[in-house]
């Protein structure tokens, strides 16, 4: 869509307008933009841009970018923005910088974008200073420079910069962590209608001690009203957990649904879990998978993983290992360690793929490096049994130890067993017992309880040990460990 191709209702006024001064054209251009009468503005702004008014050139570029449909429209928009910037329009430079970041109508060039943001900021564009601050914070990780730029933009009443500056204080990025100062800046951002500022303030009240659920709710509501998906999602959490309000699953679901509709992948995945786990609604696995898949489409690693699990188990859908593999792969690519481990399980068992123990172990390693206890434990199993890797008890112990430190109960049990038997490590009954106890008493793992029961069963010197053995076999049985049930039955028969 070219400017020359556009016809608007202002044509009857052209003779009158042609007699106006360039200053009047520019003023009329701004007034029409303020009224959001973009069709009329385009004709007027074109004249004032030709007369050398930078703002009008910027406005033309914005209109074309907003309503353009082809790459040619973006190229034409970039041309107007370039002219605007050359005429020292701060907004024109800032917007053109964004074009270079995204490669809209121009060759993508982050260095050129930085140069343009720098010029915009020097021309006192709060937007330019903010975007330049983002470059220094995220790309260059120069916290001092980012802080200085956010401070300038915040002083120019740019709410997003106040929020980002607060975020730096909240997390201690390049400055001493200061929650009180962060909250002041979040409040200023929120007052400047930054939904991110309202959300961040709510987040601080919700999660930081001393927690203030009432203030968290107030600020999440402000953020949600301004269409912040994160604000709506966390407001849903408040109602699910009954924090400062009466627990209300329906209200929670409404807010989480809104967050999903605002394209929060996490919210869509959470909504899937609400239907899968019957949280305030009747279980509906078809709805669950619909929301999980939408979450996955929005790059929620959990959404992809739970979709894969339903295909793996054939719940709500026909069992399909190929589909499970596809969704585990995407989730793993999104750095979900548990999905990498589950994908490794498919290759380990040959489910929907040709069995490949070596590749399975590689996936377990990737999962473990992403701090998946399941992945570390599976890799420990591979080294213990020599599956896809050379058998190595020492390596097995290392990975069981890491998995146990990640609170994976099965691995704590296996680590204890290695100390019990002296596999890859000196025999140490004290460490064996300690790991069994963590597995059973702390992490409620049936296998660990079974091993702990066995530990006490072999201590035949007193009746107290026999009672403890019975206690832990009983717990193992209640946790679904069949061998624990069998040992418990033997003890009961003997009695």
Residue spans of the language-model regions?
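Classical Sec-dependent N-terminal signal peptides that target proteins to the secretory pathway
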Residues: 1-26
């Amino acid at each position: 869509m070219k400017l020359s191709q556009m016809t608007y209702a202002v044509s009857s006024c052209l003779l009158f307008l042609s007699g106006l001064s360039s200053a009047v054209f520019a003023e009329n251009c701004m007034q029409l933009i303020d009224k959001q009468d973009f069709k009329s503005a385009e004709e007027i702004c074109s004249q004032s841009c030709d007369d050398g008014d930078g703002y009008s050139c910027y406005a033309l570029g914005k209109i074309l970018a907003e309503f353009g449909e082809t790459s040619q429209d973006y190229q034409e928009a970039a041309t107007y923005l370039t002219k605007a910037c050359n005429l020292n329009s701060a907004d024109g430079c800032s917007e053109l910088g964004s074009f270079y970041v995204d490669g809209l109508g121009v060759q993508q060039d982050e260095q050129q974008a930085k140069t343009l943001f720098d010029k915009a900021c020097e021309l006192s564009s709060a937007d330019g200073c903010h975007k330049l601050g983002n470059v220094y914070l995220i790309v260059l990780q120069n916290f001092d420079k980012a802080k200085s730029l956010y401070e300038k933009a915040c002083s120019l009443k740019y709410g997003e910069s106040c929020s980002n500056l607060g975020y730096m204080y909240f997390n201690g990025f390049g400055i001493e962590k200061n929650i009180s100062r962060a909250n002041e800046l979040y409040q200023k951002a929120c007052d400047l209608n930054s939904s991110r500022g309202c959300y961040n303030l709510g987040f601080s009240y919700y999660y930081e001690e001393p927690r203030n659920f009432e203030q968290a709710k107030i600020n999440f509501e402000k953020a949600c009203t301004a269409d912040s998906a994160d604000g709506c999602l966390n407001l849903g959490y408040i109602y699910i957990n009954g924090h400062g309000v009466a627990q209300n699953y329906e209200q929670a679901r409404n807010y989480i649904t809104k967050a999903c509709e605002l394209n929060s992948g996490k919210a869509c995945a959470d909504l899937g879990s609400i239907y899968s786990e019957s949280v305030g609604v009747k279980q509906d696995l078809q709805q669950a998978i619909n929301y999980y898949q939408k979450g996955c489409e929005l790059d929620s690693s959990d959404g992809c993983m739970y979709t894969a699990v339903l295909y793996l188990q054939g719940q709500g859908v026909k069992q399909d290992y190929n589909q499970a593999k596809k969704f585990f792969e995407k989730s793993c690519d999104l750095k979900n360690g548990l999905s990498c481990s589950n994908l490794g399980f498919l290759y380990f068992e040959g489910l929907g793929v040709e069995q490949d123990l070596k590749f399975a172990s590689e996936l377990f390693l990737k999962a473990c490096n992403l701090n998946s206890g399941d992945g570390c434990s599976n890799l420990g199993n591979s080294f213990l049994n020599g599956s896809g890797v050379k058998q190595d008890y020492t390596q097995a112990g290392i990975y069981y130890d890491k998995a146990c430190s990640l609170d994976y109960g099965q691995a704590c049990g296996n680590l204890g067993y290695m100390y019990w038997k002296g596999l890859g490590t000196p025999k140490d009954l004290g460490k064996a017992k300690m790991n069994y106890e963590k597995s059973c008493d702390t992490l409620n793992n049936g296998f660990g309880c079974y091993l702990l029961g066995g530990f006490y069963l072999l201590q035949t010197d007193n009746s107290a040990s026999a009672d403890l053995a019975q206690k832990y076999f009983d717990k193992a049985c209640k946790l679904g460990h069949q061998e624990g049930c069998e040992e418990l039955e033997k003890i009961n028969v003997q009695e």
